[in-house]
């Protein structure tokens, strides 16, 4: 089982959601199913089928969260030196063709939000960046094609999740 790096805040939120689903929501759904079952014929009982569907979705979420929390490796990126790109690093890249500057922060898969500049450590882009130093040249494959960037800066900034 491969560990997945994760921020403490994310681990706490996922663990709380898992506990809520297991200790509260399961009981609520079971009660709704029992009440719907008492309404009679199960073949044409919309309330029963809706509750069973909801139960299936909830159990799938419980299984997913159990896996993610079980594989989590809580990491505090503020303790790293960030002289090389690593988990939690914010990387400032400069496009060699346009001199346009972009910033990405390497986070766990559960925390990624590419539109906000938070990229998963498992993403192809992060895999290229991990281990690189300031001044290194990297070639990234983007939706718009291949681009070459210079790593202008690697730093740690507190990570704010949405």
Curated annotation (Swiss-Prot):
One of its GO terms (biological process) is regulation of DNA-templated transcription elongation. Keywords: Coiled coil, DNA-binding, Transcription, Transcription regulation. InterPro entries: GreA/GreB_C_sf, TF_GreA/GreB_CS, Tscrpt_elong_fac_GreA, Tscrpt_elong_fac_GreA/B, Tscrpt_elong_fac_GreA/B_C, Tscrpt_elong_fac_GreA/B_fam, Tscrpt_elong_fac_GreA/B_N, Tscrpt_elong_fac_GreA/B_N_sf. SUPFAM superfamilies: FKBP-like (SSF54534), GreA transcript cleavage protein, N-terminal domain (SSF46557). It comes from the Bacteria. Pfam families: GreA_GreB, GreA_GreB_N. Residues 1-28 form a coiled coil. GO terms for molecular function: DNA binding; RNA polymerase binding. Belongs to the GreA/GreB family. NCBIfam families: greA, PRK00226.1-2, PRK00226.1-4. Necessary for efficient RNA polymerase transcription elongation past template-encoded arresting sites. The arresting sites in DNA have the property of trapping a certain fraction of elongating RNA polymerases that pass through, resulting in locked ternary complexes. Cleavage of the nascent transcript by cleavage factors such as GreA or GreB allows the resumption of elongation from the new 3'terminus. GreA releases sequences of 2 to 3 nucleotides. This is Transcription elongation factor GreA. The lineage of its organism: Bacteria, Pseudomonadati, Campylobacterota, Epsilonproteobacteria, Campylobacterales. The gene is greA.
């Amino acid at each position: 089982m491969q560990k997945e790096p994760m921020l403490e805040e994310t681990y706490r939120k996922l663990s709380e959601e898992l506990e809520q689903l297991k200790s509260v929501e399961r009981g609520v759904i079971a009660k709704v199913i029992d009440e719907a079952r008492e309404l009679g014929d199960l073949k044409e009982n919309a309330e029963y089928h809706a509750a069973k569907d909801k139960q299936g979705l909830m159990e799938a979420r419980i299984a997913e969260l159990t896996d993610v929390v079980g594989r989590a490796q809580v990491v505090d990126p503020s303790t790293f030196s960030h002289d090389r790109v690593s988990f939690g690093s914010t990387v400032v890249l400069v496009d060699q063709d346009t001199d346009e500057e972009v910033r990405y922060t390497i986070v766990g898969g559960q925390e990624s939000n590419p539109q906000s500049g938070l990229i998963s450590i498992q993403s192809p882009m992060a895999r290229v960046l991990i281990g690189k130093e300031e001044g290194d040249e990297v070639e990234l494959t983007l939706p718009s094609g291949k681009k070459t960037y210079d790593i202008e800066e690697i730093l740690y900034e507190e990570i704010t999740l949405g």
